């Protein structure tokens, strides 16, 4: 099993814009990010999705973090489907870890995608971002942006923006203007794939999502079905996260929609060649070791 902990995205700390000068002049919507699926669920049990902590994911080169939230007695907890199944703690702690990392890395820009299936009040999320010290550095667009209207990374950093926040459901931008509706900006491929060939790049969400106008999220996480229970497949992770496997599905998306996805979500991101793929997909100099 190939496990790597040093990223070309992370080692060039002197370079602006997520470790690469070449990214400074690119629009946010013209970059492909390797992202961590269920980034808060760290461990080796069947319902975990990552081996390394959120800070380690960021050190590794990940700049797109996806995470589930659930309602536990009115509080926002980082729970996997149900809090009795897996509870990684309060949202505040998760955000505080990200905030601490950002404070030590002045030229880095991070995207956070949260779920809110339990329709927790958006004001509670606002409180968590404020208490974690992120509220003053989030992106607040003055209007809904088309794909071509996104600023460059340099423009975002120059404005003091370090974080973009999206939410899948139950956000309210009239109350909290920086938690953006994911599906105003992205479409997603299906998740829960059990075929290691990843044979599809069809639109799963939103129902009428248009890849010709939205940014794309490619779910590249392999699962296995155990007596009707779908769980992350750890055994084939090195193959799933190989540059070949990632590139193959990216090519399928590009041939289907004329554009490569903006985000590739992975489980067990430090296994395989995820960062090599990120370097390659963005046409950047350097290699991952």
Predicted regions and their residues:
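Catalytic cores of phosphodiester-bond hydrolases, prominently lipid phosphodiesterases
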Residues: 16-289
